Each structure stands twice: as C-alpha cells, then as structure tokens.
Amino acid sequence: MKSKEEELIEKLMGENEEFRNAKDTHSQLARQLDEMERKPYLTPQDEIEIKILKKKKLASKDQMERILMQYR
C-alpha cells in the first residue's frame, strides 16, 4: 500500500513539470556523485566537484520539497 506522500509524488511526476525536472536533476546528480565517490583516489579537484554536486543535489531536493508543501 502506498503512502499519501508516494501517491502525491506520482501525481506530481505526471502533472507538474517543475517537480519532474527537479526530480530528474536530483537523480542525475545522485548518479554522478556515486560515480565520483567510487573512485579509489580523489584529487583535490574531485573533492571540490563532489561538494558542488552535493549542493546542487540538495537544492533540487529543496525545490521538490517546496512543491510538495504546496500540494499538501
């Protein structure tokens, strides 16, 4: 059985382009972070890139949460 939150997310994925774009961006950034963090050695530039990706990922998560709050 799906929670109300999951049902709302499914609804927004179909109806709200801004939410869909934020979720797609969040997923893409998560994949990029996974790839970067799997490296056996991180250069200082890699570490900076990881911090930037994490901030962007958090911003997209915040955007999704703001949209969810509007529909609750």
Model-predicted segments: where are they?
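Extended, charge-rich alpha-helical interface modules
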Residues: 1-72
